[in-house]
């Protein structure tokens, strides 16, 4: 069915979001049209504010509204550990369990030979720079249990082992192919407690 141009454009915009197909985009567009002007203005204002005010922490790469982020500036955290994750959503998932008290490093992607993504295409150089002259004795690799997650963890292990840094991987309480951000808190807690050395 053909929709008026403003609705068609809104549907197109929603459909560009990950996991949103045409049916859901259409539903969201019509829902948005039915919202009050005040709610639509608030929604638009919040979208723009998030886009303009958020940045990536210059230390760990986490999404933040202050640089460095509140995690990197927290002196009570364990300076001997860095937990490496794919993206900022994974930091939030780990923070929810309130059991990990070290620092983080966000890669903003994974090594993916099949997709032409190599180590230089993700945030790995800053991790290596951070580890020079630091008190870090263990790096916990918390990438998803996928082929790309495994490739990334093995690469990190190969690079860091010669420097004498212990490299561990989350235990396999996480199902192969699962995303960390969707795991429940107990599963994440068990995965951290039972991590394995690479």
Curated annotation (Swiss-Prot):
Signal peptide: none
Zinc finger (C4-type): 57-72
Keywords (A to Z) from UniProt: DNA damage, DNA recombination, DNA repair, Metal-binding, Zinc, Zinc-finger
GO molecular function list: DNA binding; zinc ion binding
Biological-process GO terms, alphabetical: DNA recombination; DNA repair
Record Pfam families: RecR_C (PF21175), RecR_HhH (PF21176), RecR_ZnF (PF02132), Toprim_4 (PF13662)
Domain Toprim per the UniProt entry, residue ranges: 80-175
Family: Belongs to the RecR family.
HAMAP family: RecR
NCBIfam families in the cross-refs: recR
Free-text function comment from the UniProt entry: May play a role in DNA repair. It seems to be involved in an RecBC-independent recombinational process of DNA repair. It may act with RecF and RecO.
Record-given protein name: Recombination protein RecR
Gene that this sequence comes from: recR
């Amino acid at each position: 069915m053909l929709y008026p141009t403003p609705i068609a454009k809104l549907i197109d915009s929603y459909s560009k979001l990950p996991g949103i197909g045409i049916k859901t985009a259409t539903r969201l567009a019509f829902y948005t049209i039915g919202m009050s002007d005040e709610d639509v203005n608030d929604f638009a204002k919040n979208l723009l504010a998030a886009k303009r005010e958020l940045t990536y922490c210059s230390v760990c790469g986490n999404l933040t509204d202050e640089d460095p982020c509140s995690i990197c500036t927290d002196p009570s955290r364990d300076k001997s550990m860095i937990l490496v994750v794919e993206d900022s959503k994974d930091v939030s998932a780990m923070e929810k369990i309130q059991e990990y008290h070290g620092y983080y490093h966000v890669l903003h992607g994974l090594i993916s030979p099949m997709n032409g993504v190599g180590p230089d295409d993700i945030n790995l150089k800053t991790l290596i720079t951070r580890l020079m002259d630091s008190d870090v004795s263990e790096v916990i690799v918390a990438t998803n249990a996928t082929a790309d997650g495994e490739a990334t963890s093995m690469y990190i292990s190969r690079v860091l082992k010669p420097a004498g840094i212990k490299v561990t991987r989350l235990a396999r309480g996480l199902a192969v192919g699962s995303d960390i951000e969707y795991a429940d808190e107990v599963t994440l807690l068990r995965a951290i407690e039972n991590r394995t050395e690479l």
